């Protein structure tokens, strides 16, 4: 499913990194999937994986010719958020900036509502 008003931002930096990784894998059908699971030090944890398919009900956000996919259960926790890619002293990684999180852990990989 693709919405006209996109409730999640997929930054150019994240899209360009996904495009680079897809090229390295030599599989143009790959999409970056972001999801939420229980766990981490704050209750919920962000996860990222590559997926070849879009399931019924998934939201897709496209940028730079690549797709970010979010399942409906995870989307409710990510509305208004941003998926970005950062490079810094702590390494390179995809990150979620989530306005719905009431608190996050020090590394930013888990949050609470």
Curated annotation (Swiss-Prot):
Q: What does this protein do?
A: Required for insertion of 4Fe-4S clusters for at least IspG.
This chain's source organism reads Actinobacillus succinogenes (strain ATCC 55618 / DSM 22257 / CCUG 43843 / 130Z)
Q: Which GO terms describe its molecular function?
A: 2 iron, 2 sulfur cluster binding; 4 iron, 4 sulfur cluster binding; iron ion binding
Q: What is this protein called?
A: Iron-sulfur cluster insertion protein ErpA
- Extract the InterPro entries matched here: FeS_biogenesis (IPR000361), FeS_cluster_insertion (IPR016092), FeS_cluster_insertion_CS (IPR017870), FeS_cluster_insertion_RrpA (IPR023063), HesB-like_dom_sf (IPR035903)
Q: Does the keyword Ion transport apply?
A: no
Per the record, its GO cellular-component terms are: cytosol
Q: Which gene encodes it?
A: erpA
One GO BP on record is:
iron-sulfur cluster assembly
């Amino acid at each position: 499913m693709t919405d006209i008003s996109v409730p999640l931002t997929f930054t150019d930096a994240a899209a360009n990194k996904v495009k680079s990784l897809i090229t390295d894998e030599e599989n143009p059908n790959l999409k970056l999937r972001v999801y939420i699971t229980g766990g981490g030090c704050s209750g919920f944890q962000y996860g990222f994986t590559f997926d070849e398919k879009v399931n019924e009900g998934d939201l897709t956000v496209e940028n730079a010719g690549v797709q970010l996919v979010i399942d409906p259960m995870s989307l409710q926790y990510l509305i208004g958020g941003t998926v970005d890619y950062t490079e810094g002293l702590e390494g390179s990684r995809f990150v979620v900036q989530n306005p719905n999180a009431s608190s996050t852990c020090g590394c930013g990989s888990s949050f609470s509502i």
